[in-house]
Amino acid sequence: MEEFHPSLFIASFNMNGKGMSKNDALTWLHQINPSKCNSLSDLVIISLQECPSAPNSLHGETGGNIPFIKTFSSCHSTMVDDEIHETIKSSLSTQYLLLADIAMGEPPSPGGTEKSSRFYGYIRLIIFAKKDTVAHLNRFGKIHQSPLLIPILSPVGKKRPRPNISIYPQNRSPDKGAVCVAIPALNILICSMHLCGTNAYLPEAHFDEIRFTELDIIAEDCEKALSKYTPTGLDRALSYFKPILVGDLNFRVEIFPNPEDKSRGGKDFKAVNDVLEEGNLDSVQKLFSSYDRLFQHLSYLEKEGKGFDRESDAGIELKQLPKRVKDLLKVQDVFTQHNVTFPTFTFLVGEGEHTSNISSSSQSTRKYSEKRTPSWPDRILISKVLTEKYAIESCGAYHGITSSDHVPIFAVCS
């Protein structure tokens, strides 16, 4: 068959366990192609973290290959109504069919639940495709006798399960990790991720080490699941399936790493917040390229040492990362020094309003919470091989949703 490169709309939102109105979904998701409203992307990929609900059988038939619907949770039998799916579906054109809806996690825990067993919602991946795209995938599957979709769940969290329930092993709770879908017809692996967060009083290098350990587990799980579907064998699976990593990867900005500077509203927070309050986009872009930890890690891996001033600044031996992690991270960040938005986290929930709709330079009137240093944990990373075939037409953040301490992000690729 002729090689097929569908246009992509990729989006991510950490929902903070809250719902979303149809108007907000319309504004956010209609960035599918803001300049050509009648030319919609072929694939719509939506990553959600701390999503308040998970998919259920009302979405469609789960027995067939498309749509693929799955939830990994101890509470599947007592789920609340899934308003999120209906909100998103109603915001899209009738040209779209549901391709996959996969989630893992637990519903948001009630207030007062101890932190060691408290859940904030599900990690979720929802994929819609235009009808002719689905037809292409079906034709490919029949010709090559391959599955249309390969779902992968990779829990990496440390939460304790609910009492008397042990559906997941120790240190593999589904509050952190990735839900993934590989599409053999396109040779792509889409991962919706939520990695380890940050606590005060410790430098980011400590948490980066945890995040890279989590990425290694995710990469290993993906390799095992994909090895029999790639002609190059287990050690090459993540080279054959080109990664699209999207979600709350939780890498942060850090100027002052000393523990005494990491307190709530402390020196590190103030140094970053002062730049943001000036409202100068050039200064914000310089802040991103100089102090965003993920930007530095990816630069170091790409340029063999350039990024951090010293490898010790990274907090881990990047050269010693397993090959599968390096394969997973052969990606291009859609946020670059020249198009990055103002930080997407951490805002005061429910306060302020946006001063512009969506653009690379949009700045919210919402205040950043002193709880954490303002950062760009929400990211869209696309395989470098794919970026040679795709142009990133636009990317940005939607500051109109105030129900979460994050704002949604998006990228349009064609």
What does each model-found stretch correspond to?
Residues M1-I10, G121-L125, A129-N138, I150-L153, ...:
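Beta-strand-turn-beta hairpins that frame and shape the catalytic cleft
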Residues N16, C51-P52, H194-C196, L249-R252:
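Catalytic metal-binding/acid-base residues of hydrolase active sites
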Residues G19, N33-C37, P55, I88, ...:
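Eukaryotic basic, amphipathic alpha-helical target segments in cytosolic regions
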Residues R118, H144-P147, R160-R162, R172-S173, ...:
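Metal-dependent phosphoester-hydrolase catalytic domains
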Residues Y168-L186, C196-T198, R211, E220-K224:
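Extended serine/threonine-enriched, polar tracts that run as long, contiguous segments within proteins
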Residues E86-S91, F119-F140, V181-A185, V334, ...:
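Conserved beta strand-loop-helix elements of the APE1-like EEP
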Residues M1-I126, K158-N164, Y201-R211, L215, ...:
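N-terminal, active-site-proximal structural segment of metallo-dependent hydrolase catalytic domains
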Residues I10, I46, F128, V181, ...:
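Structural signal for hydrophobic/aromatic residues that build the beta-strand cores
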